[in-house]
Amino acid sequence: MNLPNGHVLQNGKYRITHVIGQGGFCITYKGVWYTEVKGSLGTVQTEVPICIKEYFFKDYCYREAESFAVKVHSETGRVLFDKFKEKLIKEAKILSEVHHPHIVNVLEVFEENGTAYIAMEYIPGC
């Protein structure tokens, strides 16, 4: 049901390293963000540890083994799945505007594999 370790998202921008936890609505992964830091004399490629939350409404969906796409069991389930996916996307966008030392920073929200993902700051020990 989880994405495999090493799986890439957003055309290689993010890579899953391992599962941190999962519940009824989401699977949370630790991952890396491939980015670059630019200075006045050059650019350095770097990997930033991040947290990636995948919307996976486990009672209503499953993952295709070959494509890793998230599929819904029924049309009734599709209505519920889509409704909560849109709420998750909206919540991520709102959270991205909140900046506080005790609230995790959101990098972006995106759709891929038939579901939604939130890329956010990784805080060790949480």
Segments (PLM) and residue ranges:
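A short, low-complexity linker immediately N-terminal to eukaryotic Hanks-type protein kinase catalytic domains
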Residues: 1-16
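Protein kinase glycine-rich loop
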Residues: 17-23, 28
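Flexible N-lobe loop architecture of eukaryotic-like protein kinase catalytic domains
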Residues: 21, 90, 99-102, 124
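Short acidic/glycine-enriched loop/turn segments that link adjacent beta-strands
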Residues: 23-25, 112-115
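Glycine-rich ATP phosphate-binding loop
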Residues: 30, 38-75
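AlphaC helix of the eukaryotic protein kinase fold
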Residues: 62-97
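Activation-segment/catalytic-loop signature of the eukaryotic protein kinase fold
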Residues: 109
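Conserved short submotifs of the Hanks-type protein kinase catalytic core
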Residues: 113-126
